[in-house]
Amino acid sequence: MRFTLISLVAAFAAIAPFSAAQALDEVTVALAIPPAVHDGAPYAAAQELGFFKQENLEVKTIVFQGAGALLPQVASKRVTFGYPTSEPVISSYFNGKDTLPLRYFYNGVPTNTMEFAVLADSPIKTIADLKGKQIGVGALTWGTIPGGRAALRTAGLTPGKDVEYVAVGALASGFQALKSGRIDALNFNSSWDDMLEMSGTKIRRIAYPEVFSETAGNGFITHTDNFRDHPDLLVRFARAYTKAQIACQTNPKYCVQAFWRANPQAKPAGTDPDRALADATTLLSRRLDRVLNKADGTPRTPGRYDLKAIQAGIQAMADAGEYPSADVPVNNIFSNDLISQINDFDAEAVRQQARSAK
C-alpha cells in the first residue's frame, strides 16, 4: 500500500462518498501528516501479512495538511476514518456552532508524544527559555498546536506575543529549518525527533508538563452514523490494525522492510543499508513501546481510552486558557464501546506469524 500526499482538490475527485455499497470492504483513512516508518509500518504489515484481507477490507490512505483540513472530510463522509489528534475535535465544542458529528473509536497514541526540541548547544533548556523565540511546526493547521500553546502558557508565555509558531514543513524540511537557525525550536513528536538524532544532529528535548502526558493523541475517528450503521466495519479495521501493531512489536525489522517495499521513496538513500535498517528498527520499536506499553512496562489494552486522564488533560488545557472551560462530554467524543470486540483475536498466533515473516 503506497501513501500519497495529494491536494484537497484531488482528494475530492479521488474519494467517493461513503456509501452502503462500499462500506463493508473499502476503507479510506485520512492522515494529518505524512507517514514515516514508525507510524506507517503497521499499515504495510497489515497488507503483507493479510490482516486487512482477513477482515475483508481494502484500505487506502490519503494525507491532508493537518487535522484542520482532515476533519471536514470525515464529517462530510468523504473519507471513512481519520487519524487526527484530539484537540481540534474538543475545541469544536466551544465554537458556538454545531459540534462535529464525529467520535473516536480507537486510541492510536495513548500517551502524548509531542515535545519541543532545540539544538544541543542551544541556550534554551526550559519551556520558559522559549520566550522571544520561533517554534517550527509542519503546518499552522496542525491539530497538535493547541497542546503546544497550552504547554507554553503553563510556563508563563503568551503564544503570538512572547513566542511565535512558524510553518516549516514536515520531517526533513523542518529538521533543516532548525539546523540552519531559521527557527529556534521544533514542536514535533518524539519519533520525528528520534529521526533527527539518528541523522547525526544532537538535540535537547524539552517535555510538556506532566499533566499532559496521558492525554489522547492521534486516534481513529469516524462519523457518528457509522457507530449505528456500520459498527462491524470499525471493529474489523481496528482489529487488523491492532494485529499489525503486535506483529511489528514482535518483528520490527520485517515491518520496516515491508514499509520500504510499499514506499520505496522512504528508504534512506546514500547511507549504509545495515545502519539504515537498524536505525529504522529502533525507531519503530521505540514508538510501539510507547503505544502498547505503559510507562512502567505493563501492557496497555490496545485502542482503549483513559477517560479520566483525558478529562484531566482537558482541565489543564482550560486552566492554561486554551479551552474556555473543561465542560466537555468526554464520553461523546471518545468511545471504548468496541474495544473488547476489536481485541477478540489470538495475539499469540499473530506473534508466531510475525516471527517467520521476511
What are these regions (language model features)?
Residues 2-20:
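Gram-negative bacterial Sec-dependent N-terminal signal peptides
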